Amino acid sequence: MKTMTLRNWFAIIVALLCSTSALAYDFEIDGIYYNITSESEKTVGVCGEINGYYLYGRFNIPETIVYKNVTYSVTSIEERAFYKNNRLSYIAFPHSIKTIGDEAFYGCSNFYLTVLPEGLTNIGKSAFAACKKITSIEIPKNVTNIGERAFHSCTNLTSVKLSCDITSIPSQAFASCRYLRQINIPSTVKNIGKGVFYECMALASIELPDGITEIGDSAFYFTGLTTINMPNSITDIGSHAFYYCKLTSIDIPKSVKSIKNSTFASCFNLSSVILHEGLTDIGGRAFNYCRELESLKIPNSVTNIGEYAFAECSKLTEIEVPEKLEKIGPSAFWFCSKLTSIKIPANVTRIESETFYGCNGLTSIEIPANVTHIGSRAFCGCRGLTSIEIPNSVESIEGNVFRECLEVSSIKVDKNNKMYDSREDCNAIIDSKTNTLITGCMSTIIPNNTTSIGSDAFYHISKLTSINIPGSVTSIGATAFRGTRITSIEIPDNVTSIGFGAFWDCERLTSVKLPNNLSAIESYLFDFCTNLTSIVIPNSVTSIGEKSFAYCRNLNSIEIPEKVTSIGHSAFYLCTNLRQITCHATEPPVCEKQAFEQVDRLNCKLIVPEGSEEAYMAANEWRGFYTADGIEGFEDESIVDVYNLQGVTVKKQVRMKDLQGTLPKGIYIINGKKIAVR
């Protein structure tokens, strides 16, 4: 046996000392641990209980204890004293208790709190958080401080009586108390902190006292509030304060200068809002998704409306905007689909992106003479608009500003505008520097000096049935004619590029002439052109993009030039009537997966250069087509071998005239050639 050294003994003693101090108590009496909090005042605090010593989870804490012949008053429950003690069900507090520390009863899921001691002055942070058996609570009158999250997630708490004279209800004090139905707010309270009643879904009403000045961020977020009084003393309402409440009406006090972000967002039942003079700012998403709101008068004092402020207010038909308004944020009226008119004030210099996106009810809009910028999709989807006028002040127009404005028949740009024009009364907006047509309509006539047709220029203008593209045009942008009802199109040879999906969804398109200098068929170019029957791909083309002819169900034949080296994913997907493919490339173009998915290969003839049959038969995605040489291409006296596609011999050394009519329907290999029997 080895002899213990002095160093070994020292290590053991240190370990014992450390383990003792980790318990953090001074002494134990009757199974309860205590700390001496003041020797001079002879006070102690409860800091826990001996594991296994409890009496069915019930404790009677004495008012005084005697330790070493000294009498101490028990004045506090220390921090984390009973933290997550699931055995604890009841404690009788002595009147001497003044403080309950942070997380003292946190997570005591079986603890029934009955009465707090009258002498209590302080409740710590998260003191009773997640005590799921507490159903009601009365805060004694002497309490001057309640910590943050004090009763957070007391999910069965239904009523709270605040008898104390506190001035503030701290952050998340009652958050996630989902069954809380009743609580009084003392007249002394000036501030309701952040998230105090967050997710108190059963809380339907509350009375705020006169004198209250501040409602914190998310204070009533996702509560069941249907009504609430708003005293005139309130000066500040935080962001998300009433988010997702069931309020039907609100009168915001004159003392409030700013409505912050998402304050009343997703209040789906809110139908009446009263705003007063003195208000200067309506924040982003302030009334987003208030779907019952039909009309609103914004005070003259308001100078700013934030992004998405009234987005998805789908019943809003009328809104009175003040003359002093200087800024309207992006998407401010996004999908206010029943809004019929709005006057943009003269002080507004920018119309931001998506400001009026999806406002289907707008029939006219006047862009003020001071506006210098119109953001992307600002009026996209305003399907009731019939005319557009651009003032001379406009210096920049971003993409898709008037996309899907289906009823527009007149477009004019002020003649003094230096950046844009509508030359020759073309009923379009043209970028004067680049000669690019950026916005068209059903009545557009493309001028002869136009060099480009911009992306989405005629996007989903369903009343456009024909268009003439002049020889000056060299490029057509992505989805430029998507969703139009043109029936035929002739693209001049000067065009060298046609963008992604340029004729996507042109369901009435039956014929197309592509330019001879085109280098690629871009993805989705003729996707869903369901009435297209045939098309000649120019010899200059080297690639056919993804889904370029997908869903062209009436496409009967296609001719692929010899320079084509690649065919994209699902390029001819669901071309169910395709009966002939002529491919001039001696090497089979590389096809991505499903290039010919749902094409009836058994009934689709593949014509390839002589000598290339075997290469096509061996190539992915080309397998399964039958070649142009049918059985009738052989001499009657020819002796042939017949195999199925798996290489199994079907007939051996048989004369062709004896083979006629004997093979079941299918694809066979006869003397090295793939043959279809139908």
Residue ranges and their predicted role:
Residues M1-N8, R678:
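Positively charged n-region of N-terminal signal peptides that target proteins for export
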Residues W9-T20:
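Bacterial N-terminal signal peptides
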Residues A22-D26:
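Boundary at the C-terminal end of the N-terminal hydrophobic targeting segment
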Residues D30, S432, G440, D505, ...:
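Short strand-coil-strand connectors
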Residues E39, Y54-S76, N86-T99, S109-N122, ...:
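Structural signature of tandem-repeat unit edges
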Residues E79-A81, G101-Y106, G124-A129, G147-A150, ...:
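Consensus positions within tandem repeat domains that build extended binding/scaffold surfaces
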Residues G611-G630:
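A recurrent domain-boundary module in secreted/ectodomain proteins
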Residues D629-R678:
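C-terminal outer-membrane/trafficking sorting elements
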